[in-house]
Amino acid sequence: MIIDKLKSLLQEAPPAMAFEISEAGIAAARIGARAELDFLPLKPGTLCVSPLKENVLDPDEFVMAVRSLAGTQAARKRRDVALILPDFSARISVLDFDSFPKDPKEQASLIRFRLKRSVPFDVESAAMSYWAQSGAKGKTDVVVVIAPLEIVSRYESPFRTAGMNPGMITTSCLAALELAPEAGLSVLAKLTGRVLTVVVRDKIQLKLVRCLELPSPSMEDVVSVLVPTFVYIEDNLGRRAEKLLLCGFGASTAEAESRFAEELGVEVEPLRSPLGTPGENNAGLLGYLRSIAKNN
């Protein structure tokens, strides 16, 4: 049960399949010389994504969907698969430390202590992964992904039942970042239903991750999050963001590009993939496949 960076895991042979889960359905890819993509919608109410409560509301429907996508995979020897969870099912934070211990146990203990006041669930029993980056003025920035163990386990369970081993688990936005240019100071705004994930990255280093449920997926509600984010960037990083990447805006992408460019004074473009336009329910999967292509 691991939530981890993609690059360190992609040094090994890629898994047989990869799945991205959303309330709308499950996006899947059979990984080989050429990836075979599929998407199976879920009945409304099967999942309700949250970092605080049960996500799988209809386990039987979820299990049937997983088995349908797995096909003959379930009849073979148990194989590793990659599992991409919804952003809103976990919390991603970037913590800065004046000094960061070398011992992994001390690191984990220090991180959990820092998160106790900001994470609305029990951090001691939660599934957690993290990695360190060089920070400003000699500090260490640590990217932390944490989720209640019960939530992660419920997402994993149908895949294990179907004869698969979720050997790599990550979140949609982290996987989707593999589609973003690794240059300059950029912002990714990823919309999935009413959940907006905003990721600030300076070249390959994460600086800020926000994931919140909006009152509605309207332009006004998205702008109300982006404006203070861009102010934060300028105030804390000392310069303006150079590019805003959009994902999940669907038919409203062109309107969003024009409006955000005008209101934020930044270059705006959609997130792109060689395998098609990344959408609100498959951007993480396409990013993961891009990583495999780049690292193999």
Question: Residue ranges of each PLM-predicted region?
Answer:
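Hydrophobic/aromatic-enriched cytosolic interaction surfaces used to assemble or bind macromolecules
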Residues: 1-296
